[in-house]
Design a protein with these regions (language model features):
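Alpha-helix N-cap/helix-initiation motif
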Residues: 36, 40, 214, 247, ...
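Glycine-rich phosphate/pyrophosphate-binding loops
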Residues: 61-62, 67-72, 76-78, 232, ...
Length: 392
């Protein structure tokens, strides 16, 4: 099939709509089930590139959770400890396959943003991963294949209408890509940058010690940024993005947004949150919403009389600002990547508050010296990649 007709484009008034191969060749993707839309395909193809490159860079199965053409989360398939399994709501599923662990991590980092995601998987979808996907609110999935059992499980989702795409893992796009804006055609070479350890050789700080685990996290941050709408900043820990700040016009706002998401990820692991007693039958999405409000500044909205009873068996104690700060002070060895240089040291100060130890960024600011000095103050390790990673 060389084209697929779509119901509409970005919005219902944008008709007609289709995806097609300009040279008339076969599309590298098959719709196995459902009727994916324009934005679904944008998420699927961007997400597939991301997980394909994560797998190539780390040798581990990878997954990403996309919303509106940026990742809400991305991860490789490292095992989950008991705490992560609980905050990702998968502690009832037993031991998971590496691919399922990757998606649990990708979905779990920012569950509020991942609601209604489009999923990309680097490997053939197995039954463990399908079972995890089935219970989440999601628009669709793309993978290089599906086991018979996994496909059967996914076909039970959305009353049989769940979008299931199969991508040809051997497909190689043309080296030039085009798009139109206002009837004008833009052409550029594809961003085929190979994110490897060599990009991280130029360490500009006094501390130059990067353990292997941090090296993997730095590569993950750069690959995630490569497929995130700019400006973007990405915090990573233990093989998964824990905070992604996408599409901001100011670098510091990217760093703050991503940092606040990383903070929320860590606060969800605190004893106060882990000990919340939810009412029986409360769904995962409602639990996520309650936690998000509880750990935020508007906590009174979920603790008010007549409200807390809808979510909790026992009224939670207030999670004070001081208690939250004390818990966040225990977050360490976090990596942060930036798709362009940090123009001021305020980005480093903000990153430090979220436990950042390792930084990967292009460098090239007239204030690089001040940024490096701030990193040295906190004994951070920073590598200048010399490569910008804008994505639009």
């Amino acid at each position: 099939m060389s084209e697929i007709q779509l119901k509409y484009g970005c919005n219902p008034n944008q008709k007609p709509s289709r995806i097609y191969m300009e040279d008339g060749s076969e599309l590298p993707v098959k719709v196995l089930n459902g009727r994916p839309g324009y934005i679904n395909f944008l998420d699927a193809f961007n997400g597939w590139q991301l997980v394909k490159e994560l797998k190539e860079a780390t040798g581990l199965p990878a997954a990403t959770s996309f919303k509106h053409v940026s990742p809400a989360g991305a991860a490789v398939g490292l095992p989950l400890d008991d705490t992560l399994a609980k905050i990702y709501w998968v502690d009832d599923l037993g031991e998971l396959s590496p691919l399922a662990c990757a998606y649990a991590r990708a979905r779990g980092a920012d569950r509020m943003s991942s609601f209604g995601d489009f999923i990309s998987l680097s490997d053939v979808c197995d039954a463990d991963t399908a079972r995890l996907i089935k219970r989440e609110v999601s628009d669709g999935v793309i993978a290089p294949g599906y086991t018979e059992e996994a496909f059967k499980i996914l076909m039970e989702k959305k009353k049989g209408a769940y979008n299931i795409l199969e991508i040809d893992p051997n497909y190689q796009p043309a080296p030039l890509e085009k798009k139109q804006v206002y009837g004008i055609t833009f052409e550029q070479g594809r961003n085929e940058l190979d994110v490897n350890a060599g990009l991280l050789d130029n360490i500009v700080t006094d501390n130059k010690e990067i353990p292997e685990s941090a090296l993997i996290d730095m590569k993950i941050s750069l690959i995630v940024l490569k497929y995130t709408q700019s400006n973007s900043v990405c915090y990573v820990k233990n093989g998964q993005a824990i905070g992604i700040g996408a599409g901001q016009q100011s670098r510091i706002h990217c760093t703050r947004l991503a940092g606040s998401k990383a903070d929320n990820w860590f606060l969800r692991q605190s004893p106060k949150v882990m000990g919340l007693q939810f009412v029986d039958g409360l769904g995962r999405a409602d639990r996520d919403n309650a936690i998000d409000v509880y750990i935020g500044d508007e906590y009174e909205d979920v603790l008010a009389e007549g409200v807390w009873q809808k979510n909790f068996k026992v009224k939670p104690e207030v999670f004070t600002r001081e208690e939250k700060r004390a818990w966040l002070n225990g977050m360490t060895d976090v990596t942060v990547g930036s798709d362009a240089f940090f123009p001021f040291s305020d980005n480093i100060e903000r990153a430090h508050k979220s436990g950042v130890k390792y930084i990967a960024q292009p460098g090239g600011s007239v204030r690089d010296d001040a940024v490096i000095e701030c990193c040295n103050k906190y004994n951070m390790v920073m590598a200048f990649t010399g490569i910008r990673l804008f994505h639009h």
